[in-house]
Design a protein with these regions (language model features):
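Alpha-helix capping and helix-coil boundary motifs
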Residues: 20, 128-131, 324, 363
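Alpha-helix C-terminal capping segments
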Residues: 1, 129, 343-346
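C-terminal outer-membrane/trafficking sorting elements
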Residues: 317-364
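Metal-dependent phosphoesterase/phosphodiesterase active-site architecture
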Residues: 55-137, 142-148, 164, 169-173, ...
Length: 364
């Protein structure tokens, strides 16, 4: 009851791809969440089940549409990518559903829409809010997951395109949906795609259960100074997936392409078996997450508490661009001096100036 708003990471309905899905939206608003929306605003993230040819999702929420208006490659729907500040936290809501817009290739793991439009938008938001002590991204489809969607063919593309953006923007936490399972992943080093083990402490060892707690871990403090924590809070509905076994993850290497994938699951990882939700309390350099199961006619039952910690301030994005000129040259390729004396950092048909701003992108 003390929450300031409710974050919902997508899939409000099951049959959104059907043009006749309005009855599900009516049930969602009138029955499922009426007590919630009468007390607080909802921060929506569009899920793959919410997307429909009649754009029904966009008629139910009033979110900012500047991203679509300014994007070089336009997303399908209005208001699916937006940001806002609340307290010390910058929230960046975005969608991975449009990765195929513009030019993309699942073999080379490239998407001009994600790398350019979404990536540049992330950088603009971070640069515009240097006062933010925390940077939290919200998305439906997973960058990392260990359940029903671990094998999705587009997920490696999401990692290849989004991890450099998360690193560049020093994103602390990514709240995901899609997988209907409870998963604490990381903090992940964006370059090596491995957990930063010295950033994890106070994780309790508990009896392992093949469904409710695959890792046999509970609680923990996760320091995100040098990496990003990924969290999926299971589901508040009735559609549930079970966690994948370590052997399954190893066998699926050719699909997910991440070495020692199971090691990324550094906290509790399992299926609560009941509708669940998590509360987030921000207090200075600590975010406390309490996760609850819901039983009809009973008080919610706390089943896990963990803490996210940041002990170092973010680098202001403008300063970071100045400091990383040599790294940018190494990453993006050669340096060209223009006739007016300005310097560009160029790779193929894309160029940045020395502040890291995109100058042109002629890739199709």
């Amino acid at each position: 009851p003390d929450a300031r708003f409710c974050v919902f990471p997508g899939d409000f309905v099951e049959t959104g791809t059907n043009r006749n899905s309005e009855w599900e939206w009516e049930r969602w608003f009138d029955e499922a969440v009426r007590p919630v929306i009468m007390q607080m605003p909802i921060v929506p993230t569009d899920g793959n089940h919410d997307d429909s040819s009649n754009q029904n999702y966009t008629y139910h929420f009033n979110t900012d549409n500047q991203f679509k208006e300014n994007a070089k490659v336009k997303p399908q729907f209005d208001g699916t990518t937006y940001s806002f500040m609340y307290g010390d936290v910058l929230f960046l809501v975005y969608s991975l559903q449009d990765y195929w817009k513009g030019s993309y290739n699942l073999s080379t793991l490239t998407s001009t829409y994600l790398t350019n439009d979404v990536g540049n938008w992330f950088r603009e938001q971070v640069a515009a809010h240097p006062e933010a002590k925390w940077r939290v991204a919200l998305v439906h489809k997973n960058v990392f997951s260990g359940s029903g969607h671990q094998e999705d063919e587009e997920t490696p593309l999401f990692r290849e395109t989004m991890l450099p953006i998360f690193k560049d923007c020093e994103i602390d936490l990514v709240l995901q949906g899609h997988d209907h399972c409870y998963e604490i992943i990381g903090p992940v080093d964006a370059d090596t795609r491995t957990p930063i083990l010295n950033a994890i402490s106070d994780v309790e060892t508990v009896p392992m259960n093949m469904v409710s707690n695959m890792t046999g871990k509970k609680g923990g403090v996760f320091n995100v100074n040098d990496g990003t924590l990924y969290f999926i809070g299971a589901t508040c509905g009735t559609k549930r997936y079970n966690p994948n076994h370590k052997l399954t993850m190893e066998a699926d290497y050719e699909k997910h392409k991440v070495e020692n994938y199971y090691d990324l699951f550094t906290g509790m990882f399992g299926q609560p078996g009941r509708p669940s939700y998590s509360s987030f309390t921000v207090d200075g350099n600590i975010i406390t997450v309490n996760s609850y199961k819901v039983y009809e006619g009973m008080e919610p039952m706390l089943f896990n508490t963990f803490h996210i910690k940041r002990t170092r301030e973010h680098t202001p994005y403008s300063e970071k661009a100045h400091k990383t000129l040599e790294q940018m040259i190494q990453e993006y390729g050669t340096v060209k001096i223009l006739h007016n004396g300005n310097m560009l950092i160029v790779r193929e048909n894309i160029a940045y100036d020395t502040l890291g701003q995109l100058i042109y992108d002629n890739r199709d």
